[in-house]
Amino acid sequence: MIRVHQLTRAFGRVRALDGVSWTAQPAQVTCLLGPNGAGKTTTVEIAEGLQHADSGTVEVLGADPWRAPAEHRARVGVMLQDGGLPQAVRPLPLLRHLSRFYASPADVGALAGELGIDEFAGTTIRRLSGGQRQRVALAAALVGHPEVLFLDEPTAGLDPHVRRTVWELIARTAGDGATVVVTTHSFEEAERLADHLVIMASGRTVAEGTAAEVAGSGTLETAYFALTDRSEPA
């Protein structure tokens, strides 16, 4: 489980987070939806232990991720927005290397096959397309069978067939009991994946619930623009 409570974070005079709060439950996909600058990535990086909040608290698997030991981090899978992958290696040796850090890793061959990585397995990371790197980064996040999984825009740049495969894999990971958090700009992705939806704007949570609850009597798109437009500073 993840609990985010009243987080604030400023970069100089820019207030990236302004008291944001939300929760994410095991065996569910929680989608964070919001415009650029809403604070989604900053919030997730704090929950991953990559940044420290100015105030507020965050708990991931009952621990503060900023101070968590290596054993805690091994239970958490992270897919960064920029991939964060070493450039000079090929995908399969990288995934096999990562799998050695876990007691019960995923089957690298099966995972690579499902994501179509075997189609470009002989190419170094630096020569892959953006969509291909996305798939390798997702596999790297999944290889340890994480209890918590953070995915920052996991289907950006993917073609429709691969995107559908990734959605199915994410849903199955949550179905196996993981707490999955996905940041996205896509209404389709949020409606397809989210058991729980958080809409962020201007560093705050402006709506939280199921996609149907957030949409109300209209569409999610209509509700989103109504919520985020009125949250923008004048």
Positions of the model-derived regions?
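Conserved ABC transporter NBD signature motif
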Residues: G56-D64, H72
